[in-house]
């Protein structure tokens, strides 16, 4: 996504993520979404870039930094194409360092319903976990 802007960064137990959104979704984020009962417009897109992480050994304080690229995840809203998942489609691509290519992950091979199942926890936020932090 060449026109993606940074929404936020996050860290799980196994990865650091950069979360980017296209201009349609960024406009919605800046207007206050995800908010209770408000929906992202069709055409909204998110890309998440996952890296493993390591401790920066030269920093004077404890900080984790990106290490190896792990995967890319894509989320797109199109209520006509994806009615079974409230308009959201999910795709996940695992990075293969040996071939320097991406391949569909287990999540992608399971279909949009698999990504949707996880996101039902935030249905009140139109199925999007990450908010747009103040800046």
Enumerate the language-model features and the residues they cover:
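Sequence context surrounding c-type heme c attachment/ligation sites in exported
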Residues: 13, 37-135
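N-terminal secretory signal peptides
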Residues: 1-42
């Amino acid at each position: 996504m060449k026109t993606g802007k940074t929404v936020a960064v996050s860290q799980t137990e196994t990865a650091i993520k950069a979360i980017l959104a296209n201009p349609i979704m960024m406009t919605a984020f800046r207007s206050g979404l995800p908010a209770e009962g408000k929906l992202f417009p069709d055409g909204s897109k998110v890309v998440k870039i996952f890296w493993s992480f390591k401790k920066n050994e030269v920093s004077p304080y404890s900080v984790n930094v990106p290490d190896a690229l792990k995967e890319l995840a894509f989320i797109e809203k199109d209520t006509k194409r994806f009615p079974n998942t409230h308009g959201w489609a999910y795709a996940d691509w695992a990075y293969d360092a040996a071939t320097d290519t991406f391949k569909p992950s287990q999540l992608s091979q399971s279909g949009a319903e698999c990504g949707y199942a996880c996101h039902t926890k935030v249905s009140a936020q139109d199925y999007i976990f990450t908010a747009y932090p103040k800046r």
